[in-house]
UniProtKB/Swiss-Prot annotation:
One of its GO terms (cellular component) is membrane. It is found in: Membrane. Its EC number is 1.14.-.-. Belongs to the cytochrome P450 family. One of its GO terms (molecular function) is monooxygenase activity. Its cofactor is heme. Keywords: Heme, Iron, Membrane, Metal-binding, Monooxygenase, Oxidoreductase, Transmembrane, Transmembrane helix. Signal peptide: none annotated. It comes from Arabidopsis thaliana (Mouse-ear cress). This is Cytochrome P450 71B9. The lineage of its organism: Eukaryota, Viridiplantae, Streptophyta, Embryophyta, Tracheophyta. Heme binds at C440. Gene3D superfamilies: Cytochrome P450. PANTHER family: CYTOCHROME P450 71A9-LIKE ISOFORM X1, CYTOCHROME P450 FAMILY 71 PROTEIN. The chain crosses the membrane at residues 1-21.
Amino acid sequence: MATIWFLSLLFLCCILLAAFKHKKRRTNQQQPPSPPGFPIIGNLHQLGELPHQSLWSLSKTYGPVMLLKLGSVPTVVVSSSETAKQVLKINDLHCCSRPSLAGAKELSYNYLDIAFSPFDDYWKELRRICVQELFSAKRVHSIQPIKEEEVRKLIVSATESASQKSPVNLSEKFLDLTVSVICKAAFSLDFHTSVLNNDGFDKLIHDAFLFLGSFSASNFFPNGGWIIDWLTGLQRRREKSVKDLDVFYQQMFDLHKQENKQGVEDFVDLLLKLEKEETVLGYGKLTRNHVKAILMNVLLGAINTSAMTMTWAMAELIRNPRVMKKVQSEIRNQMINKSVITLDDIDHLPYLKMVIKETWRLHPPVPLLLPREVMSEFEINGYKIQPKTLLYVNVWAIGRDPDSWKDADMFYPERFMDNNIDAKGQNFELLPFGSGRRICPGMYMGTTMVEFGLANMLYQFDWEVPDGMVVEDIDMEESPGLAVGKKNELLLVPVKYLGH
């Protein structure tokens, strides 16, 4: 009898083991392919200094849908327009939330902002208000006089350099332009003559970007990573950055209380008015911390990204004289006898728009769209994507995908001439602002800033490389971070155009 029981038990164990192996094999077949990793850290070591480039290289081996283990966090990366469409459009509702990220949590006052807040009724109501009030076409047009004034200042500065035949640091000038416009639009303050004009403000923005884009162990090891962040001093530096930002916000609020302002309502005016009206957002009323979190999105989302795009565009143009000549001819032939190009003029400059789209294709300001968190199971190319998985869309890789773009490494704006591809999130080959429910709400504001600034610099000046250099010396190396700009500053010599 004992023998029968033993044999029966052994037989049952064999059946269970076979079933387990079959289930495991089936599960593995349903998961996306994965590069091999190490225990504990998984694939973290494969990200490198520029993760979008490293992930692009891995996708050439493992395909456009990859599963990685970043520490203890399962992460899926998609790298083609077709898989991006499945994520951002077809299955958007399954994966439009945000993960918990240490830096984002603190900078957004526990996810009270638009960019990093999880998907819920609060986020939907906040986004609706911001789209209607802060980032509407009406609001963008209302700050056009600010842009025109700041561009005139930039033209004066570049004209002085042209008279001396000295180089202009365009990386610095474009950043200064966007900072000046945003500071006036948000705070009604002149960056050059106000309390903002000091290294402290620049450091505030730089540090905030740094903490959002730098490695934080808490993000990859939720149960114990905070210890590493504490030991390395990251947590202390992050807390100081948030405290400094808090002081800055309060300073802006105090200035608005003191002033009896007239004219265009700025962003702080609007947000403080919504706070005073006790505007309801999902589960509660809009508070001062909500206002601070939204201002953080405005500062970080608008300043660096627009400046980076203008810098990349000028770098590509100086390296491609044919394109430079063609876009300048279009602008100058269209804008005869005008001192400054206006926003209305931009609609008559189709080739300029192609140049900007081509710049976004090769140099998207945020090459890995902000991570999404999967809320419910869905499939990409037959692979099952599980809840709580992090999901990245590599728009940098998509812009270089030979299946979507002929001669993908070439800067060739004419590729947009015979198609209707735009950057508004419906064409998944070109996604500088993302797509779906999480598309950048400030897309129109950012686009007009780039178009306006770039058009005027190309209209007013011809551009040359400094003495002792040739165009091939202009490098295209990238700087690491959440938003990826040109690693080395772009210095060019302006030559005043006298034909207008």
